[in-house]
Amino acid sequence: MRSIRKSPRALATATATALLAATAASAQSDVTLYGRVNTTVEHQKVGEASTTGLFNNSSRFGFRGVEDLGGGLKIGFGLESGFASDTGVAASPFFARRSEVDLSGDFGRVRLGRWIAESYFATADYVSLHNHDTGSSADALYAYVSRDANKVAYRTPVWNDFTLEGSVGLHEQVSGTPAAAGADGRNSYDMAANYKLGALALGAGYTKLDQVNQFALRAFYAVGPFLLGGYVQRDENAYFADGGKRDSVRLSGAYLLGASEFHVNVGRAGAYDNVPGSAATQYTLGYNHNLSKRTKVYGYYTRVNNGAAASYQSGVAGADFRSLAVGVRHNF
């Protein structure tokens, strides 16, 4: 996510305004302040170039609330902003992670605004166990193609542990005018399904934006101290224009022992039909130690082996990426 620098005064003003709004709203609704600070010290290498430094891992804070309207109806809202925990720089747009209002009841839930695609949460995010799919060990191979802004969505009620959500991201381009940045005259469409059957959890996600699309299936199984998950995905033109189709797969596993967690995560992306040498493999070994329910210290080693035309995580075609990291994460 791109960021721009904001002055301390501007950031303080924005935060204070949000806090005052939340305080005023609490008189008539249930409002919660929440967030996460997640920071690592890492030694990274891209090809033969290396660096050691402090890195942010999708730190964020937000406000969410709900008001009971009576008759089974509830109105809710969510505002969530990312920030760089290593520098303090705020994300732009400020509430890029989430800014929505929703109406819910026995009929389900209607959502309006901006949020991260539910197809992603139903598949790739669900099986990324060691560091919440953030930072340098995040899933570099998953094809995320959704337009996050200007969305209208409907989520069904829970039917025997099954839910379905569909959304449309409106392009908002005025007819007869040239396309502006981010307004290409095409709506985006996103679908997500989740189902639980005892220890087995299944999910699916589909997204389409003009000539780019993806479809993924996920399974996750928990038995005793063992966790095992994985997904398969087929996308078209997600990383290369006119690249054709590509298949990818990821497996993750964890063993829980008291306050300790041992993690392994392996992903493989095939080459696009029209881009020879665009295949890649990613693997991560990690260890987490939970100091409390909200705080953990952790370490991991992650590596992405890129084909000659692939630049996953490295940003340089043909260059491999690797990182050795230790970090602290605190939820509030």
PLM-predicted stretches and their roles:
Residues 183-286, 302-303:
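Detector for outer-membrane/organellar transmembrane beta-barrel domains
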Residues 73-75, 107-111, 161-164, 199-204, ...:
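Repeated loop/turn-to-beta-strand initiation elements of outer-membrane beta-barrel proteins
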Residues 20, 64-68, 104-106, 155-158, ...:
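Structural signature of outer-membrane beta-barrel channels/translocons
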Residues 49-59, 95-97, 146-150, 185-189, ...:
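Residues that define the transmembrane beta-barrel architecture of outer-membrane proteins
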Residues 47-50, 138-139, 176-179, 237-240, ...:
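Extracellular loop and loop/strand-boundary signature of outer-membrane beta-barrel proteins
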Residues 1-30:
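Cleavable N-terminal export/targeting peptides
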Residues 28-43, 49-171, 185, 194-198:
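Outer membrane beta-barrel
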Residues 191, 289, 303, 319-332:
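Outer-membrane beta-barrel "beta-signal"
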